Amino acid sequence: MTDSKSAAPTTLYDKIWNDHLVHEADDGTCLLYIDRHLVHEVTSPQAFEGLRTAGRKVHAPEKTLAVVDHNVPTTDRSKPNPDPESADQIAALAENAREFGVTYYNEFDKRQGVVHVIGPEQGFTLPGTTIVCGDSHTSTHGAFGALAHGIGTSEVEHVLATQTLIQKKAKNMRVTVDGALPDGVTAKDIILAIIGEIGTAGGTGYVLEYAGSAIRALSMEGRMTVCNMSIEGGARAGLIAPDEKAYAYLKGRPMAPTGANWDAAMRYWETLRSDEGAHFDHELRLDAAALPPIVTWGTSPEDVISILGSVPNPADIADEAKRLSKERALAYMGLTAGTKITDIKIDRAFIGSCTNGRIEDLRAAAKVAEGKTVNGNVNAIIVPGSGLVKEQAEAEGLDKIFIAAGFEWREPGCSMCLAMNPDKLAPDERCASTSNRNFEGRQGFKGRTHLVSPAMAAAAAIAGHFVDIRDWR
């Protein structure tokens, strides 16, 4: 544990890194101890097969949690999975978890859900821990002050076998967001604004620490949304120092410490903040009060614009490579420069994902949907982030609000965030989505994705086009 009294001022990232450093070679290559390993069906089959071939066991099965999420249908699960490859991956994870003694939530377990929803929900995610998963949005767990990031399949095998990971240390960037968010502006708008400011490569080589009064004011769900999309800004991970909100969220969770162990953990957790005077390699500041509801218009998360804006003209971009890229984006999205964002009609709406599939997100969407009706030209689906989120939403009657308004109420899973299950866009369909990526084909071949907050997605589903949620009645 870092002795902050005698050491030079240290960042939160540096503290967690130093507490988990096993060995550092002369070239800066490090061996890092991993506290928690989350596993899903897509990036794990080859890793488990590698263990089997080498005759190895999972080093720490008690520190490994597996769940099926990417490929599961969100409709009737009593029927066979329509995609044979997906069915094989799901079956493989069940068998691998059984063989290697790993805790596993299958598609019929109410604890099942998107991997980055269930980790915090179960108390598997804890402040000051190192967390990895074969999934790029592992940065979500940084909302609790955990150093969390995605890894590749070969690294999944390495962590399963050794509970360590070979890494090189990143640089520190602090993003400070101060001020009060205006009504209708959310955590999703904060992170989209940050990505719009730094670009999708601006965080490359960095771990981002989010700070400031606007970040502190966010709920844990909101903080998870911000940290979730750190990777879209190019960063390795995102962090928020834990506080009373984080502790209250975790206390009593099934896998969280209890009794004297909780007290001991709290003593450590309360040291997890960047010291006054700690060095950051880069600093960025945003004024929360100046942020509008944001919509992406192109095929990169950095293509952000205010709901009151218009589609930009690539001809105004001096850099030729960037201009050509944005011209391609406009053509793919089927948009014309100068079109008002509020004039863009949609065909589909998706509310869910590891970015915005938690209870707070569903409450925000239900508040918009109550007493309204989904536009006749729009298909809209609500996909809870986990079985427990679904259970809570139904206890609050949110499902009835959505169904009465014409939304489809689904089972938990990654769903339309990515085209790896039955929920996907048809060519040229346009979607208001609460997910994290708007790349070409992300939600389906030739599908067109606009990233927005849950309230904005619900409003667009009802209006049939994007609207300013601040004016919603």
Curated annotation (Swiss-Prot):
<dbReference type="InterPro" id="IPR001030">
    <property type="entry name" value="Acoase/IPM_deHydtase_lsu_aba"/>
</dbReference>
<dbReference type="InterPro" id="IPR015931">
    <property type="entry name" value="Acnase/IPM_dHydase_lsu_aba_1/3"/>
</dbReference>
<keyword id="KW-0456">Lyase</keyword>
<comment type="similarity">
    <text>Belongs to the aconitase/IPM isomerase family. LeuC type 1 subfamily.</text>
</comment>
<keyword id="KW-0100">Branched-chain amino acid biosynthesis</keyword>
<feature type="binding site">
    <location>
        <position position="414"/>
    </location>
    <ligand>
        <name>[4Fe-4S] cluster</name>
    </ligand>
</feature>
<dbReference type="InterPro" id="IPR018136">
    <property type="entry name" value="Aconitase_4Fe-4S_BS"/>
</dbReference>
<keyword id="KW-0004">4Fe-4S</keyword>
<keyword id="KW-0411">Iron-sulfur</keyword>
<feature type="binding site">
    <location>
        <position position="354"/>
    </location>
    <ligand>
        <name>[4Fe-4S] cluster</name>
    </ligand>
</feature>
<comment type="pathway">
    <text>Amino-acid biosynthesis; L-leucine biosynthesis; L-leucine from 3-methyl-2-oxobutanoate: step 2/4.</text>
</comment>
<protein>
    <recommendedName>
        <fullName>3-isopropylmalate dehydratase large subunit</fullName>
        <ecNumber>4.2.1.33</ecNumber>
    </recommendedName>
</protein>
<keyword id="KW-0479">Metal-binding</keyword>
<dbReference type="Pfam" id="PF00330">
    <property type="entry name" value="Aconitase"/>
</dbReference>
<dbReference type="InterPro" id="IPR033941">
    <property type="entry name" value="IPMI_cat"/>
</dbReference>
<feature type="binding site">
    <location>
        <position position="417"/>
    </location>
    <ligand>
        <name>[4Fe-4S] cluster</name>
    </ligand>
</feature>
<comment type="function">
    <text>Catalyzes the isomerization between 2-isopropylmalate and 3-isopropylmalate, via the formation of 2-isopropylmaleate.</text>
</comment>
<dbReference type="GO" id="GO:0009098">
    <property type="term" value="P:L-leucine biosynthetic process"/>
</dbReference>
<dbReference type="InterPro" id="IPR036008">
    <property type="entry name" value="Aconitase_4Fe-4S_dom"/>
</dbReference>
<dbReference type="GO" id="GO:0051539">
    <property type="term" value="F:4 iron, 4 sulfur cluster binding"/>
</dbReference>
<dbReference type="InterPro" id="IPR050067">
    <property type="entry name" value="IPM_dehydratase_rel_enz"/>
</dbReference>
<dbReference type="GO" id="GO:0046872">
    <property type="term" value="F:metal ion binding"/>
</dbReference>
<keyword id="KW-0028">Amino-acid biosynthesis</keyword>
<keyword id="KW-0432">Leucine biosynthesis</keyword>
<dbReference type="GO" id="GO:0003861">
    <property type="term" value="F:3-isopropylmalate dehydratase activity"/>
</dbReference>
<keyword id="KW-0408">Iron</keyword>
<dbReference type="InterPro" id="IPR004430">
    <property type="entry name" value="3-IsopropMal_deHydase_lsu"/>
</dbReference>
<comment type="subunit">
    <text>Heterodimer of LeuC and LeuD.</text>
</comment>
